[in-house]
């Protein structure tokens, strides 16, 4: 039996390391070229200056100047919402006043139970504008009569035992000026016909007074209704006199 011979020489495969002797490695030389890679970290001179200023302020105890407050959604409301102006609600109340018949199906009590300020004010101002006739003082008179006339109706209603707030009376009286605004352009056309003009004026006053009284005079007044309806009727006669100049 022959003894085993020396192991075969290792032949490296492609991709394996090849070890060479130190004597052969003395003549090996080379270099590795580094790729030209530029990194844009977004650092500019302005950023450095800002960082320096930020550090300076914080060191001096003025870091609170750099704090950014979180935006409150309440601050981004539309202007109409900020002023509590609901155009759809105002339009619905206008329809309730102009069409006071219960058969039309409008929830007319919303004019009284959900009062607002901007709608009646707009109606009163519009009535004042068409009542000018070159007399600017009429505007202040109409607004004054609206405020103090509503106060008189409110006090009378409370004396008679009605559960109504001044804001409700102010809103109802203001909205109920709309019938007088409707008849205003008609009076311009038929002004030369005295009889027709008088009938239209009476119709407008009755229309306005009925709209206001039907909203303000509740079942709690019972037999005392005429005591409140009569001053409301007189109030709208006075409003009409400011318009016509009578």
UniProtKB/Swiss-Prot annotation:
<feature type="transmembrane region" description="Helical">
    <location>
        <begin position="169"/>
        <end position="189"/>
    </location>
</feature>
<dbReference type="GO" id="GO:0005783">
    <property type="term" value="C:endoplasmic reticulum"/>
</dbReference>
<feature type="transmembrane region" description="Helical">
    <location>
        <begin position="141"/>
        <end position="161"/>
    </location>
</feature>
<comment type="function">
    <text>Involved in the maintenance of the Golgi structure.</text>
</comment>
<dbReference type="GO" id="GO:0005886">
    <property type="term" value="C:plasma membrane"/>
</dbReference>
<protein>
    <recommendedName>
        <fullName>Protein YIPF4</fullName>
    </recommendedName>
</protein>
<feature type="topological domain" description="Cytoplasmic">
    <location>
        <begin position="219"/>
        <end position="225"/>
    </location>
</feature>
<feature type="transmembrane region" description="Helical">
    <location>
        <begin position="198"/>
        <end position="218"/>
    </location>
</feature>
<dbReference type="InterPro" id="IPR006977">
    <property type="entry name" value="Yip1_dom"/>
</dbReference>
<feature type="topological domain" description="Cytoplasmic">
    <location>
        <begin position="162"/>
        <end position="168"/>
    </location>
</feature>
<comment type="subunit">
    <text>Interacts with YIPF3 and YIPF5.</text>
</comment>
<feature type="topological domain" description="Cytoplasmic">
    <location>
        <begin position="1"/>
        <end position="115"/>
    </location>
</feature>
<feature type="transmembrane region" description="Helical">
    <location>
        <begin position="116"/>
        <end position="136"/>
    </location>
</feature>
<keyword id="KW-0333">Golgi apparatus</keyword>
<keyword id="KW-1133">Transmembrane helix</keyword>
<feature type="transmembrane region" description="Helical">
    <location>
        <begin position="226"/>
        <end position="246"/>
    </location>
</feature>
<feature type="topological domain" description="Lumenal">
    <location>
        <begin position="137"/>
        <end position="140"/>
    </location>
</feature>
<comment type="similarity">
    <text>Belongs to the YIP1 family.</text>
</comment>
<keyword id="KW-0472">Membrane</keyword>
<dbReference type="GO" id="GO:0006888">
    <property type="term" value="P:endoplasmic reticulum to Golgi vesicle-mediated transport"/>
</dbReference>
<keyword id="KW-0812">Transmembrane</keyword>
<dbReference type="GO" id="GO:0005794">
    <property type="term" value="C:Golgi apparatus"/>
</dbReference>
<dbReference type="Pfam" id="PF04893">
    <property type="entry name" value="Yip1"/>
</dbReference>
<feature type="topological domain" description="Lumenal">
    <location>
        <begin position="190"/>
        <end position="197"/>
    </location>
</feature>
<dbReference type="InterPro" id="IPR045231">
    <property type="entry name" value="Yip1/4-like"/>
</dbReference>
